[in-house]
Amino acid sequence: MDLILLIGIATALLIILLTLYFLQKRNAPAETKAAAQPQRGVPLRAQEGVPRRAQIARNQRNRLRANQNAPDAVAPVAAAPAAAIDPDGDEDGDENGPRVPQGAVLDEKMGAKKRAKMEAKEQKRLQREQELHDREQRKVKEAKEEAERKQQDDLDAEVERKRVEAERVVKELHERKEHEMYLKMKATFSVEEEGFEEDDADDKEADFIQYIKDNKVVLLEDLATTFKLKTQQAIERIQELQAEDTITGVIDDRGKFIYVSEAELAAVAKFIKQRGRVSIADLAESSNNLINLTPVTASEGGA
């Protein structure tokens, strides 16, 4: 009795399994066809059951490992939060938005358009970093050149300052030497000028005396004009010469000086000695014969 019951149960289970097998086999072609044709409007990863966030995190980890092996690689940026990425897969944004990590391994199943966009964005980022690096290098180079230029300018300024100082010293020495020579020459000229002045004074005095002797009767105003003197200066000069016994004569009340030579004075003295006592009238009458009042030039012309 128990054996028959067990056989019946086993048979029922076998029938159920066969039924399920045939039903599953019948539905398999439809599922395969549906899997071969992706649904429109649904992301490929969603259809394949691959989580997008997990794929991005895995790519970032791959990129970090790649940067650790590259000595010149730029320091990796922190992984962007998954919430910052558009759930629909649109990663377009400004430059401050999420960036594709350098060296990230792109999913082979990613669309060609999105792959190209991400590669272009990565290339742009690398180019920007290179530009920043070049700019920093250029700034360093310019700063170095500016420091060298300033140092050279300081050296040139110091050389110029020393040159100007040397020229100033040489100029001062030259001027001092010239001044000393000038003082020596001036002293020499002063001595010579004093000698010339004395000679000129002697010559002028001789001319003054000779003029009086030649003219015999001299109008004092004419004498002063001839020798560029004032009348009073001419009178004083005559008085000085008379005091020195250089010339002899008298100044009358008409402003004339009458010159009397030594020979004429001797003749007058002889006349008075011969006559004994002589009146002024007799002396005046005889003076025309004793004293020659004719100018020397006129007497020479008459001869």
UniProtKB/Swiss-Prot annotation:
> GO cellular component terms?
endoplasmic reticulum membrane
Q: Name one GO molecular function term.
A: ubiquitin-like protein ligase binding
Pfam families assigned to the protein according to its UniProt record, in alphabetical order: DDRGK
Spell out where the chain crosses the membrane.
3-23
List cystine links. Answer: none
Q: Where is the composition biased (Basic and acidic residues)?
A: 106-160
Q: Which stretches face the Lumenal side?
A: 1-2
Span list, region Disordered: 31-53, 84-160
Side Cytoplasmic, residues: 24-303
Q: What does this protein do?
A: Substrate adapter for ufmylation, the covalent attachment of the ubiquitin-like modifier UFM1 to substrate proteins. Required for ufmylation of Atg9; protects the nervous system during aging, possibly by stabilizing Atg9 and supporting its function.
Q: Which family does it belong to?
A: Belongs to the DDRGK1 family.
On subunit structure and binding partners, the annotation says: Interacts with Atg9; the interaction is transient.
Q: What is this protein called?
A: DDRGK domain-containing protein 1
What is the gene called?
Answer: Ddrgk1
